[in-house]
């Protein structure tokens, strides 16, 4: 093999990227750190993968997913499980859980709800916060490193919707905010 060409050159470039703290591999490492921290935090308040929260509103949200599965309608305009006709209730979270259930073939609503919760906290929130910080700090390394840790240290965002009552729609909306602000 030729020196300095092919996979060896790419491998060295990737290693330099990781060590120097610049480039896509370094960003992937920061994201993985932040996602892991968020996952640990979320895992601390569920007893088992298919357990559901014993706080306010949980049964409503689990039943809303069941209602969508049973009726086939995920429209906020026609959701009348407990609301009066003509009332609008945000079903983005419930639709996401239902879609995940249908695509995965899983049958347990609590299990899929927890899986989506982990995905939103670990993937959506951390990706959005790190990307927004990169945009606001002109990709300065110190800003991205601090954000990777602090994204999981802020107790109110987005986790307040999970710890106080179960406010899944607010949790999803809060997790989406950094990406929307880009």
Q: Where do the language-model regions lie?
A:
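Membrane-interface transmembrane helices that cradle and orient dolichyl/undecaprenyl
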Residues: 177-182
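Active-site lumenal/periplasmic loops and adjacent helix-entry segments of GT-C-fold
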Residues: 37-175
């Amino acid at each position: 093999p030729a020196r300095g060409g092919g996979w060896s050159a790419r491998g060295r470039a990737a290693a330099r990227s990781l060590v120097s703290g610049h480039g896509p591999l370094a960003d992937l490492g920061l994201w993985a750190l932040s996602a892991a921290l968020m996952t640990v935090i979320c895992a601390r308040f569920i007893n088992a993968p298919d357990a559901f929260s014993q706080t306010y509103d949980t049964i409503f949200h689990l039943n809303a997913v069941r209602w969508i599965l049973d009726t086939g309608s995920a429209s906020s305009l026609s959701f009348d499980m407990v609301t009066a006709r003509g009332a609008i209730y945000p079903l983005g979270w419930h639709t996401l859980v239902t879609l995940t259930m249908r695509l995965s073939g899983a049958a347990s609503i609590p299990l899929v709800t927890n899986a989506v919760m982990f995905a939103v906290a670990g993937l959506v929130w951390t990706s959005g916060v790190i990307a927004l910080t990169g945009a606001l700090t002109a990709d300065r390394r110190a800003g991205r490193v601090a954000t990777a840790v602090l994204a999981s240290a802020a107790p109110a965002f987005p986790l307040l919707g999970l710890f106080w009552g179960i406010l899944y729609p607010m949790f999803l909306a809060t997790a989406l905010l950094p990406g929307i602000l880009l």
